[in-house]
């Protein structure tokens, strides 16, 4: 549940930042894409769709995404994301607890925009 709440609030932060910061909104318009964040068993997740600088988000697994950020399970995802540091994330990748499926460039773009939204 904590993982899903964190993903929900990530979407709220991105929307809020875009509403209050015209430069940030321009950066969101750089890509039209769908980013999926989910658990490996597909039981928990959320996706974010960016179209011409606007973002929509929904709970669940998207039918199609440009990149999927796949966590081994919700507990590992929440604990790692809560730390908010790149070292912890890289450790999860090295341990096989986090995988990217699809366009890594889109994943990096999304992670940068998520970080800027804080």
Annotated model-derived regions:
Residues 1-118:
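Feature captures hydrophobic
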